[in-house]
Amino acid sequence: FRSHEMGMVDDAIAALQAAARSPRQRFDAASMLGRIYLERKDTTRAIEWLERAAEAPAPTPDAGRALLYDLATTLESIGEQARALAVFVELESESGGYRDVAGQIERLSKVQARG
């Protein structure tokens, strides 16, 4: 059963990669790919796809904010504090008061200041 499930996910990945080539489907397909790779603990690929999604127009402001938040927390999880901070700052400038972004910025700024 497990190998069958993995095969289905691999098929979905191939279909989503093809869909991500279409400008109209890029955000949704790339963000789904990012989340699949996060579940697989493949953070390098997850970040690559989340960044591609972030470059595409989000279908809704909430979807765009959620994607940027996921990207920032994933970057931080691999020690990329400066990049995570930059994404959080972008998110805060676009939509102040989203989740705990202000606190994340304050915390990461202190980490950066300590070097």
Feature roles, as predicted:
Residues 28, 62-66, 100:
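Start-of-helix register in tetratricopeptide repeats
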Residues 32, 69-70, 104:
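"A position-specific structural signal for the A-helix of alpha-solenoid helical repeats
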